[in-house]
Amino acid sequence: LETLNSLLHPRVAEDYKGWLATHRHEKYVLREAALCYEIGLSRSVDKMIVVSAPEDIRIKRVIARDAHRTKEDIQAIIKNQLPEEEKVKRADYIIYNDNHHMVIPQVLHLHASFISGEISVHRQHIS
């Protein structure tokens, strides 16, 4: 896995730089990455949005999406990730995806705040 990541991540990063350059005039851009904190991407963005859900819900969703994965497989993956509580603690913004909060209104609120300038958001710099 390490070898694959060492080959893949530089190419993905290079592709992203090109994409970002073509969108440099946008008010803001988003970058999705499941392991932002773990692989250091959090240092290359201005703000972090964490989508948070309890572990039991995350496990159920992965099993529904990837029927070949067992609960134990998923728990092993989660164990190698930064704890959810730490991600939430480090986040600038949190979207709760826990079956108790409606996700779309949270997203629309952030979008409106970013567009209006109510929340200061700087574009990423291409390094």
Stretch-by-stretch model annotation:
Residues 1-28:
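ATP-dependent small-molecule kinase phosphotransfer cores
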Residues 12, 24, 43-44, 65-116, ...:
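Small-molecule kinase domains that catalyze NTP-dependent phosphoryl transfer to phosphate-bearing small molecules
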Residues 28-38:
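Switch II (G3) loop of P-loop NTPases
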Residues 30, 42-65:
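Conserved phosphate-donor/acceptor-positioning beta-strand/loop module used by diverse small-molecule
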